[in-house]
């Protein structure tokens, strides 16, 4: 129980750094999958512009698959950490087992979509036959072989919930390295491997994900000894599943809203294919920065959930304070890098006709990173304190209620020739700032009614 003692006794600022750094690296490497694919695809000799557009269009579905898996993992993470904090290993075993049962169900749905749904989805966003063909090929492979990313996401959260985030990072590094090695081999054709283009990018991605999942499965079996493991614990338990999704469903919806937002933004930008591609490329850079906040959030949530389960008001408040402080520092670094080096990122993707749109998007949307990062931290805090509804409210504001109407209205002025495409990019910083204001109010409320009621701090 050394890991639980660490969660209980180590100073929160040191604990958050110790747990947060591996998680931040893990999330950053997860974003690398998409960036590496786009970088190699953008440098194809033939059809690179169409291929980049295709990857932009398939991205929302990739995000949605990850959303469901990670959201399920987030619920598992918080519930498992809280259960361990309450010293209930029997329930913890059921939580872990039921999460894996849910993974099987999630994969079955992704498989069916990969077989029957990808053509209609891609065709809804473009009429270019080359883009449609490339998009179908790439997305079908990712869906049919999605079990890698699904079970990686679940085992990652099981390891994080017990304080073993280093092992999840090792698995992620292995997957990223496999992906990076295989991308040029399978895309361009090196040695005995034939040139496969965008299909090669898809295969490289899923093989990397499968490698990560297998390694994390081994780590889970070997190191997670706080609770029993076995197929018997995968038997569905309605109470456990409801407990997982009472926390995880808002996280799933939050991630799913990102997919919906990107899909609708693709439709809004459909009048300009170069701007559409530029948005897709920038979104992958933006994810790389925001995934740093997501990684820290994944340290914030189990730490606060654990001490909330133990009833330690001081450590809860420390978790909130340090979580927000570290997030702001990370986002400030992200803003600095993206504002100083937009041309370098454009060169990485060989952006072509999309270059100027991409640079404008980076300079404008990057302003929003500070507020976006704080919003992500707020959501991690809410989830740890059983504040799923508050987390959902922030997600709805950020990805639906404010951003899409605002971008839609701005696009009218752009299509009429009154303003340039850059006007649409301003919808993002405006949205994040307004959402951050609401998030602050919700944080004050949840601290008053969830943390304020705690009186016994003997366990802290």
Predicted feature residues:
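Short alpha-helical transmembrane segments in multi-pass integral membrane proteins
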Residues: 1-20, 80-147, 193-249, 304-368, ...
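N-terminal transmembrane alpha-helices
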Residues: 7-39, 43-47, 60-75, 79, ...
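Transmembrane helical elements of multi-pass membrane transporters/channels
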Residues: 18-37, 141, 175, 208-212, ...
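Transmembrane alpha-helix boundary and packing residues in multipass membrane permease domains
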Residues: 23, 27, 39, 78, ...
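Helix-terminus/linker motif at the lipid-water interface of multi-pass membrane proteins
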Residues: 28, 32-53, 122-129, 185-196, ...
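Small-residue hotspots at the loop-to-helix junctions and early N-terminal turns
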Residues: 49-60, 135, 139, 202, ...
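Small-residue-rich hydrophobic transmembrane alpha-helices
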Residues: 52-112, 149-168, 278-336, 340-342, ...
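Short runs within selected transmembrane alpha-helices of multi-pass transporters and secretion channels
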Residues: 73, 142-160, 168-176, 201-216, ...
């Amino acid at each position: 129980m050394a890991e639980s003692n660490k969660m209980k006794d180590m100073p929160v600022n040191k604990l958050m750094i110790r747990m947060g750094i591996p998680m931040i690296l893990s999330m950053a490497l997860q974003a690398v999958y998409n960036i590496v694919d786009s970088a190699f695809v953008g440098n194809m000799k033939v059809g690179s512009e169409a291929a980049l557009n295709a990857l932009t269009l398939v991205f929302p579905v990739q995000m949605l698959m990850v959303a469901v898996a990670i959201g399920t993992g987030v619920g598992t993470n918080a519930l498992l950490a809280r259960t361990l904090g309450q010293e209930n290993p029997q329930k913890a075993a059921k939580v872990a087992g039921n999460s894996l049962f849910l993974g099987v169900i999630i994969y079955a749905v992704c498989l069916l979509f990969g077989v029957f749904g990808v053509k209609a989805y891609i065709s809804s966003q473009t009429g270019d036959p080359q883009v449609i063909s490339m998009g179908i090929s790439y997305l079908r492979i990712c869906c049919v072989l999605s079990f890698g990313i699904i079970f990686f996401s679940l085992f990652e959260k099981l390891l994080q919930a017990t304080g073993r985030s280093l092992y999840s990072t090792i698995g992620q590094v292995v997957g990223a390295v496999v992906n990076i090695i295989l991308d040029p081999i399978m895309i361009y054709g090196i040695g005995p491997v034939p040139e496969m283009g965008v299909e090669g990018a898809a295969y490289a991605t899923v093989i990397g994900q499968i490698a990560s999942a297998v390694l994390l499965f081994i780590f889970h079996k070997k190191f997670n000894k706080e609770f029993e493991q076995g197929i018997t614990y995968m038997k569905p338990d309605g109470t456990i599943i409801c407990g997982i999704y009472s926390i995880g469903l808002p996280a799933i919806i939050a991630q799913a809203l990102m997919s919906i937002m990107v899909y609708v933004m693709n439709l809004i930008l459909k009048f300009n294919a170069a701007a559409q591609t530029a948005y897709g490329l920038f979104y992958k850079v933006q994810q790389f920065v925001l995934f740093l906040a997501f990684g820290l959030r994944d340290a914030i949530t189990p730490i606060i959930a654990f001490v909330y389960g133990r009833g330690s008001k001081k450590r809860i408040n420390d978790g909130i304070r340090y979580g927000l402080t570290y997030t702001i520092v990370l986002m400030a670094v992200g803003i600095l890098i993206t504002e100083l080096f937009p041309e370098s990122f454009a060169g990485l993707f060989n952006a072509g006709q999309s270059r100027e749109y991409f640079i404008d998007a980076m300079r404008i949307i990057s302003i929003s990173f500070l507020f976006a990062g704080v919003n992500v931290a707020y959501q991690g805090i809410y989830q740890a304190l059983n504040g799923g509804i508050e987390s959902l409210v922030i997600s709805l504001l950020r990805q639906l209620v404010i951003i899409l109407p605002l971008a839609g209205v701005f696009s009218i002025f752009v299509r009429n020739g009154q303003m340039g495409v850059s006007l649409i990019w301003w919808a993002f910083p405006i949205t994040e700032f307004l959402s951050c204001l609401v998030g602050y109010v919700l944080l004050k409320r949840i601290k008053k009614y969830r943390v304020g009621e705690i009186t016994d701090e003997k366990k802290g």
